[in-house]
């Protein structure tokens, strides 16, 4: 039984790892809190599956020792070729799958070899990510998409959008809606961030020309409402420089 919509029981290990750039020597990064492996390995074809358990699904031994915090998980690979994941939320299950990807090495064909053992891991730092908040040419849309996927693969959870030379984030157009093409890009960034369990934070930088009036206070709120319609759910106000 799986308590999450993110991943379904019966997910093929080989299918999940297909197309991944698997390392010749597996390594988990960031380094997990606890790990215990034997010298054994197990080979997978398309048949083995992943069982994911959550407290909502009734719990199991897969949750033993897993702290109740976002992103925590346990990953168990048995000598019999069974893969189990215990997590309290979708982010934890997602991170466990990233660890599984890091542990896999390809055989000569389409199969995958995994080490036998278990990992219990959880984040020490609540907010893990970057701020795109510099002056100069902002990152391209493609670079941002690549960054968001990289964050998910490496278990980071925060991206703050605040490039100072975006005139719709800063002056002179922070009060105005994004043009349609740029709005569509924001929507896609939010979507990809969600897929990778990254919190997309959109920041406004109004300090160059804001007027300390009720009108401009309402303009800030209106801009946040515009961004909300694009899918943004986390916001920041920058007065750093």
Over which residues does each language-model region extend?
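Phosphate/pyrophosphate-binding catalytic cores of soluble transferases and nucleic-acid-acting enzymes
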Residues: 1
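Gram-negative bacterial Sec-dependent N-terminal signal peptides
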Residues: 4-21
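Acidic, contiguous N-terminal accessory segments
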Residues: 8, 22-91, 99, 106-120
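Feature activates predominantly on carbohydrate-active enzymes
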Residues: 70-240
């Amino acid at each position: 039984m799986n308590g999450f919509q993110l991943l379904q029981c019966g997910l093929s290990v080989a299918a999940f790892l297909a197309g991944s750039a698997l390392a010749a020597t597996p390594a988990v990064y960031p380094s997990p809190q606890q790990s215990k492996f034997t010298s054994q390995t197990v080979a997978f074809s398309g048949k083995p599956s992943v069982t994911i358990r959550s407290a909502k699904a009734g719990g199991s031994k897969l949750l033993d020792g897993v702290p109740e915090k976002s992103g925590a998980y346990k990953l168990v690979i048995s000598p019999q070729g069974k893969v189990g994941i215990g997590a309290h939320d979708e982010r934890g299950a997602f991170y466990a799958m990233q660890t599984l990807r890091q542990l896999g090495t390809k055989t000569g064909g389409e199969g995958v070899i995994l080490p036998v053992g278990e990992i219990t891991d959880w984040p020490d730092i609540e907010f893990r990510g970057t701020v795109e908040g510099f002056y100069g040419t902002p990152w391209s849309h493609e670079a941002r998409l690549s960054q968001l996927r990289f964050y998910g693969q490496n278990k980071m959870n925060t991206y703050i959008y605040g490039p100072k030379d975006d005139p719709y984030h800063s002056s002179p157009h922070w009060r105005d809606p994004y043009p349609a093409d740029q709005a569509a890009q924001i929507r896609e960034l939010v979507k990809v961030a969600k897929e990778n369990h990254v919190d997309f934070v959109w920041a406004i930088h109004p300090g160059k020309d804001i007027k300390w009036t009720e009108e401009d206070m309402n303009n800030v709120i209106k801009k946040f409402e515009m961004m909300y319609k694009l899918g943004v759910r986390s916001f920041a106000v920058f007065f750093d420089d």
